[in-house]
């Protein structure tokens, strides 16, 4: 019985492995109609209007739209235009963020093979991979992308690179009866197989479904601002209603008090907050792009500052993603370390930490590994800046090792031409080659798994030698390395390849995917920043533990998570092995359920669902297109150290947003307190609606936005991340807003009462002092600087100066006086107003100098 479901199909009938003719064309066409093409299902298209409506339902955006409506009614068209522009910009950003999810799935199509070689009606044809159906007989060879999930019926020296799906950097051998999964790459050999699964039910389709079903979470900042929007809306309406009631009870006209109350609502809402956020994020994105980190959406920049956990893939992220010989042991027990980068044929040989000349025993081992080998190295070209492997990556690592030992691969192979071979097979797990020497003798070389060589009768070695080499091989394997044993002999007669004898052990070669340069230091920098680094890999637990140990993440006795246990629930687990894409999702979800803000780094197809599920996904620039499309941040230089710098940038941005909130909300609190308390001191109507809106426009506008460009504080990466549960007004910021607002209100009311007693136009004095005092606070909440450091934000000084001139102009220039309802003030009164206005800002600056206050606030008082 054959069943299908959705797009693609799965073969449930037993496959007749003896049929070489494949399907006939008619049957293939019928199955294609029944199951659909062998492609990843496209995401359901969402109408643009739905996406836009989704963005406009955000509480803060709704509050801004209400403010825009109010300012329109009041005739404050400049404010209306600014608010509408901010809403439009944020809506566009949000829609773009949703669209990129569809691109992540579309990228899976680009990973799939564009064409396939299939046998139909007994003839081999080239057909589009999308036309494959279950039951098709497909042939693949080195360099091909497997076009669908295949059940192998033939395989000759077949090795697959499954790293994009599994995260394992070592190629995997496959034999008849086993499966070759869609999207994997044939590195060596050739094979034929019957299609088992296509489209949505193939390995690629399964991951596509995970990506499609994994919706990105809202960022911590978005959650905080949404909560803030709701609170501000309720508080502003309640307090403005109280002002309205007090005025009406006091005999003021209802219409006048209604306009005043609405003006206070506008003043209490920091309508430039989205503009501040957008500017801060845009500047941060530009700085990060200059540091080779490209944010795919603006909120990713700030989210990095909230990160408490970085869940990192191993292959290609913490490691180079390329196989390399790291340690070798010659037949006399001498142990050497080999250095070098990637597959480049340059490096050094070290012993006991010191560089040494290449001894003859090591040279013989390198030569044997080079000769019993089918790989080659490809130099950099116009499209690639690094050396690359041609053939099996593990064998290419042996070629690079030989070159680092001073051997020229082409010259050496020409001097020892291969005349016979016994290819590697999964049963014996070894490869044997025979080479003719210049004196017409025969060099027999054998390489393979240690147990297949050291425990075989082909060796001519003592039991003591074999025991010592076997023990050494186990120790190297425990370090997470893949160990090969090499044996060789120079004989006079052509050997029997099926059962050679008399070979002498030449040594052991330990191959691994080495850590990137500086990876341990990067792990330390995350610890310093209070961010916990986790290692999540598809590799063997021994390999994961070894890499974790080198990074300082794991020690003997620590919990080691794996794909089939519940260690993900253990809060101390920092290393996970044998993880599948679904299990990575579970790990990320478990961390988020504990309140962590998670960044996930990766480069493979298997990382894409987790990249999308995490609070922020970070992809390597050289990784797969699928990973890059699913990520929020792409590291062009593939350097994880860039993430540490980006975390500092994210914290700077969040500090600046809080800095703006302290400034803007304190001004709103001051305005409401002046309107509420003023009548108690004989100031019947402290401010007219037009005056409130003018102060609001000048203080919340350009100066507020300029605060978003403040530089980072000293030591931003030496403090713990803020609590994920902390409100945007948390850590004392709400208290600071009230205290600062009360201080401004006290100064303003004091100046107004004094002016009233002196017979001066007190309402104009209140107007001038309120605006100048808020601008003084803007200067007081700047980022602290080291002694002697230049101020890194001259735009703020210019903005404050310009706004101060416009504020004073409101009582000096006749057209503005008529618009605002103010009276002229003399030079001496204006100087007195300016002097009094300095008090709130000066008090804040003095408070910041108190060591106890500075040490207790961290980012709560980032002013």
Predicted features along the sequence, with ranges:
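Alpha-helical transmembrane segments and their membrane-interface junctions
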Residues: 744-758, 809, 813-818
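Helix-coil boundary and interhelical linker segments in multi-pass alpha-helical membrane proteins
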Residues: 679-688, 750-762
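Transmembrane helix-loop boundary segments of multi-pass membrane transporters
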Residues: 752-771, 786-796, 823
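Membrane-water interface at loop-to-transmembrane-helix junctions
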Residues: 723-741, 760-761
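Membrane-helix boundary/interface segments in integral membrane proteins
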Residues: 215-221, 773-789
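Conserved cytosolic headpiece of P-type ATPases
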Residues: 1-695, 699, 703-714, 792-863
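Alpha-helical transmembrane segments
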Residues: 651-655, 714-728, 779-792, 819-820
